[in-house]
């Protein structure tokens, strides 16, 4: 009786696609309204003046201007702002 036992399932058989997170426009760069500045998971960097935050925590420019990174607030958080 030639039988083959069922193979066990593997735990490693997957490889997720890259998410392309990170800073897209750096400090000092001129951006137009709607330009994505940072793609991130959670608010590692918070939106400052003239910067909006999407539902996936993407930070984007609300007005044309120059990107500026800075820290501040009571908890010394990282912020990104747009200077007109």
From Swiss-Prot:
Domain of life of the native organism: Bacteria
InterPro entries: Ribosomal_bL27, Ribosomal_bL27_CS
PROSITE patterns on file: RIBOSOMAL_L27
Keywords for the protein's UniProt record, in alphabetical order: Ribonucleoprotein, Ribosomal protein
A single BP term in Gene Ontology: translation
UniProt keyword GTP-binding, yes or no: no
Chain positions covered by the region annotation Disordered: 1-20
GO molecular function: structural constituent of ribosome
Cellular component, GO annotation: cytosolic large ribosomal subunit
NCBIfam families xref list: L27 (TIGR00062)
Family per record: Belongs to the bacterial ribosomal protein bL27 family.
Annotated protein name in UniProt: Large ribosomal subunit protein bL27
Protein source organism: Francisella tularensis subsp. tularensis (strain SCHU S4 / Schu 4)
